[in-house]
Amino acid sequence: MPTYLSISLQYLTIRNYDCCSYDFSRLFEKTPRLRKCFISSNSDEDDDLPISREFLPAPQSLSVTRLILLSIRSLPLMTSLFKLLPSITRLKVEIYSITLDGHQWKEMIVNYLPQLKDFQFKIDLDLCRSIDDSTNEDKVDQYLSTYRTSFWIEHHQWFVRCHWSQWNEYLQISVYSLPYAFVYFPLFDNDHNYHTKSTCSSDIHHSYDSVRILGYEPWMFHDEALSHIQLINIEKLSLQLPIDQQFFSIIPKLENLLSLTVAIPTENHRLQLQALLDRAPRLFSLAFKFCVTSAMPPYRYTSSSICRLDLQGYDPSRRRHRYDIRQCMELSRSSIGIQCRILAIEVEKPKCILQLIYSMLNLRTLHVSYENDKRSNQYDLVKVLQHYLPSTWSITRFCYGHIIIQS
């Protein structure tokens, strides 16, 4: 936290900070012209230290009008922060494991954030113990009713959607404001049997344009309420081939895609991957998570934009792909291999490392895994590589079995 007064600082980002209420008091004391604050908190303790107003200017002189809070796990800490910032007009908050309903939100907003106009939030929590589908739905309806009051619907026109499912004997829910405002798509992992409801009219389709990261699964969009969604700004995507017919209605364009991780369980779907590559002109990184071993990736795919390859995938037996000398040569001669600047790969022999370095002319960073790189070896692999490679290459052992080589 700052120890000197700053009269010029207007925008501040604090990431992964384990903080308490008193820290915030000192922060705002030292930054009287702060307008926007982004805080990502690591704290999950019930910090309930009293807020001392003498550390602060008068409330009406506080300049912060926009606040973004991510990974919040302490209700007292969040409430203390709201008390310090009564001039907030725009609030975005992501909360985990805190049970908050619409009535509690209303009380905090009325008491501490009277000027709030734009409110975006997402809460993931275990609502109660799961009993059966009918009882679970009743519990969700009771919870959602707190967001259907005149304060939410008429006065502010703030609407929410809720997903719920059973997980480890608990009724797990995710509730968020509409339009959706966060980077990750708001569904639980492997949650094939989720249900969803909203406080807005069923014929209103709100935007999910903020979503940048998606692990695509067809079951995610089986509910009618989500089947009309379009995710037009995806930057990081993972999926398994073959993709279904619904994929391109959900993700109609891939112009913004930068990173793709793909699983290919059979060889019959290679053309489908090439079709995806053809639609992604800005794709920088391609990773193979799982694929058949009759031919090692990246096969014969082409893409003029890919500069990073991650070939450390698995075969159907959950064994990591290991490239031999011949396969390394084929890789270096492939279209994507020729233009590759960053490569992650596992090799069978140290000679493969030299083969890659000398034959991939555009390569600048190599993350290489070699199972037999062990402390007990007679010859240290790093020293061997230093002997055979030009001095322009730096060699770092991240750990035994994983070496990073850069030029």
Question: Language model features by range: what are they?
Answer:
Residues 1-407:
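Eukaryote-biased activation of long, low-complexity terminal tails and linkers
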